[in-house]
């Protein structure tokens, strides 16, 4: 249980060092959110 937060912090740190990857991830997350909303509206 103690190792999980550390891994998340390391991942966030690497994302801060690589803004390009962070931009891609945020776009990917936004696409998932949009897809979820559209699926909910259809159903």
Curated annotation (Swiss-Prot):
Disulfide bonds: none
InterPro entries cross-referenced by the UniProt entry: Uncharacterised_YqgB (IPR020196)
Highest taxon in the source lineage: Bacteria
Keyword Cytoplasm: yes
GO cellular component: cytoplasm
A biological process from GO: response to acidic pH
Leader peptide range in chain numbering: none
Induction: Constitutively expressed; increases in exponential phase, repressed by H(2)O(2) (at protein level).
Location in the cell: Cytoplasm
Alphabetical UniProt keywords: Cytoplasm, Stress response
NCBIfam families, per database record: small_YqgB
Family: Belongs to the YqgB family.
Protein name, entry field: Uncharacterized protein YqgB
Gene: yqgB
């Amino acid at each position: 249980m103690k190792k999980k937060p550390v891994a998340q912090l390391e991942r966030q740190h690497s994302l801060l060092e690589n803004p390009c990857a962070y931009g891609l991830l945020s776009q990917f997350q936004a696409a998932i959110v949009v897809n979820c909303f559209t699926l909910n509206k259809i159903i």
